[in-house]
Amino acid sequence: MDSSIESDLARLALQEEQLQFETFNADTAWQLGTLLKQAVEARGKAVAIDIQLFGQPLFFYAMPGTTPDNIDWIRRKRNVVQRFQRSSYAMRLELRKKQTTLTEQLGLPLRDYVVAGGGFPIRLRGSACIGAITISGVPMREDHGIIVEVLASWLNRPLSELALPPADDMDD
């Protein structure tokens, strides 16, 4: 088993444990969405951003340079977060570790589910996953990392303890 996958999975579990909210509402979503937009703009990149409590859209923004494909990727990543209550990137690495896919393991169609970085669970401390923060537009590990960076700042958690190291391969 690849030790970098194992260490990334441990870091992803820590992120999901530490980056939980005491409360979350439409104002929280608006502020986080705005911070995500600013973080991406500071990098000179473009993404689509979606924040939802499952079934209730709270924030959406498609930056100039994104396409309808980014919106579909968001939907598919969000479906993974909702079904598994984990980040879409954690699910990608879990399946890679097992050398399988969602289609092979559970029969889930690729048209509705994608295990790619950029979907992160909204979880109230001590509670279930209630929604997802999802972005699409940059490489998947970077999509995931931008969300973690903004959430760590918002929740006053040390990014140095939560950020993933740079990827070793071009796939992530």
Show which residues each predicted segment covers.
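Aromatic-enriched hydrophobic runs in primary sequence
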Residues: 11-16, 31, 59-61, 103, ...
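Extended hydrophobic
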Residues: 103-152
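Short linear motifs at secondary-structure transitions and domain/linker junctions
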Residues: 22-28, 35, 94-99, 109-111
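Juxtadomain coupling helices with adjacent low-complexity linkers
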Residues: 2-35, 39-41, 133-172
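Cysteine/selenocysteine-centered motifs that mediate thiol-based redox chemistry or coordinate metal-sulfur cofactors
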Residues: 93-110, 158-172
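Short amphipathic alpha-helical segments, especially helix-boundary/capping motifs
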Residues: 9-14, 96, 100, 123-125
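General "foldedness" signal
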Residues: 50, 63-65, 71-74, 98, ...
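Structured interaction and signal-relay segments at domain junctions
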Residues: 41-106
